[in-house]
Amino acid sequence: MLDAQTIATVKATIPLLVETGPKLTAHFYDRMFTHNPELKEIFNMSNQRNGDQREALFNAIAAYASNIENLPALLPAVEKIAQKHTSFQIKPEQYNIVGEHLLATLDEMFSPGQEVLDAWGKAYGVLANVFINREAEIYNENASKAGGWEGTRDFRIVAKTPRSALITSFELEPVDGGAVAEYRPGQYLGVWLKPEGFPHQEIRQYSLTRKPDGKGYRIAVKREEGGQVSNWLHNHANVGDVVKLVAPAGDFFMAVADDTPVTLISAGVGQTPMLAMLDTLAKAGHTAQVNWFHAAENGDVHAFADEVKELGQSLPRFTAHTWYRQPSEADRAKGQFDSEGLMDLSKLEGAFSDPTMQFYLCGPVGFMQFTAKQLVDLGVKQENIHYECFGPHKVL
């Protein structure tokens, strides 16, 4: 527990943090990667270049300082970050490195004096222990469950299937021939790669796209413009190649009773965790209403349409609606979409009028903000809306 003086000292720095903004975390990362370049093997350097990770860390630091007297308020964020950390295999000693560079950054940017540095040192130590303890629990859970493992495990690509002009799926089975751990629909795999020509090892998280089967995993990867890993997977990864995987993780998952209605809302590659949810519902013979609402640019980039249709046919109460923002003439001729333009949920209000319905969202942040606002305006409770951001987390 932190004493009152430490809490007061940390809270007194909040205006300075807010005024400085992500410049603080930019300095921190630059410093850390200069003194500890080995950490470039762990961090997603693409997120460093575009500034997303710096913004996310700044928001986390500011949130901690603001809630330092009410740590339970931070537990949802802690869980999200701890789950992600396990896919990077973060270890306790690395928290010491981060703490060292955080305090040095505060000193170099603000020269706040030893009292402030000591207070932040204590505060960081408390938070680091929360993460270390939770991550140890997750590591133990992953290692002890049937088919689970510690660290990384070699998997072989057994199938590579183009699903659209931009999305390709990969099926993976363990080289050792053993069973694989189950997971909750919506969770992701940590994929570790360092092909020839990569300056650093790259770690990415890809959503699992079907119900667990105990034998292997399936992910789907969108080719991102300028994306080092996604383009390598699309262009160079082949059936028979071996990649390293970390056990499934993630705090975004579906857990509903059979009589709970569900709406799955996605755009683009955001449908990948929804596919695992839909597959799980279909295989379980879910009896309550299930809605599948998906937005795509056009038919060329609309993946898994046939699979969704097939899964939906096995559900007794299923509604699907697809929006194409800019359909082609071929799309219109085929009639493979329902509405043109942006997703407008007001036209489908009757499909989710049940107040117990749970909503799961995934897609670009702007899309999720747009659809979440529509849901709230239509009377959906915030606590019934669950969402996942690909990349550093953002609040809708």
Curated annotation (Swiss-Prot):
Keywords of the record, alphabetical order, are: Cytoplasm, Detoxification, FAD, Flavoprotein, Heme, Iron, Metal-binding, NAD, NADP, Oxidoreductase, Oxygen transport, Transport
Q: Which reaction does it catalyse?
A: 2 nitric oxide + NADPH + 2 O2 = 2 nitrate + NADP(+) + H(+); 2 nitric oxide + NADH + 2 O2 = 2 nitrate + NAD(+) + H(+)
Q: What class of enzyme is it?
A: oxidoreductase
Cite the binding residues for heme b.
85
Listed binding positions for FAD are 188, 204-207, 389-392
Globin domain boundaries: 1-136
One GO cellular component, as annotated: cytoplasm
> What does the cofactor section's free text say about binding?
Binds 1 FAD per subunit.
Needed cofactors, names only, are: FAD; heme b
- Could you tell me which InterPro entries the record lists for this protein? Cbr1-like_FAD-bd_dom, FAD-bd_FR_type, FNR_nucleotide-bd, Globin, Globin-like_sf, Globin/Proto, Hmp, OxRdtase_FAD/NAD-bd
Q: Which CDD domains match?
A: flavohem_like_fad_nad_binding (cd06184), HmpEc-globin-like (cd14776)
Catalytic residues identified in the record: 95 (charge relay system), 135 (charge relay system)
Q: Is the keyword Ion transport assigned to this protein?
A: no
The Enzyme Commission number assigned here is: 1.14.12.17
Q: Where is the FAD-binding FR-type domain?
A: 150-255
Q: Where is this region: Reductase?
A: 147-396
Q: What does this protein do?
A: Is involved in NO detoxification in an aerobic process, termed nitric oxide dioxygenase (NOD) reaction that utilizes O(2) and NAD(P)H to convert NO to nitrate, which protects the bacterium from various noxious nitrogen compounds. Therefore, plays a central role in the inducible response to nitrosative stress. In the presence of oxygen and NADH, HMP has NADH oxidase activity, which leads to the generation of superoxide and H(2)O(2), both in vitro and in vivo, and it has been suggested that HMP might act as an amplifier of superoxide stress. Under anaerobic conditions, HMP also exhibits nitric oxide reductase and FAD reductase activities. However, all these reactions are much lower than NOD activity.
Q: Which family does it belong to?
A: Belongs to the globin family. Two-domain flavohemoproteins subfamily.
Q: How does it assemble?
A: Monomer.
Q: What is this protein called?
A: Flavohemoprotein
Q: Which organism is it from?
A: Escherichia coli (strain K12)
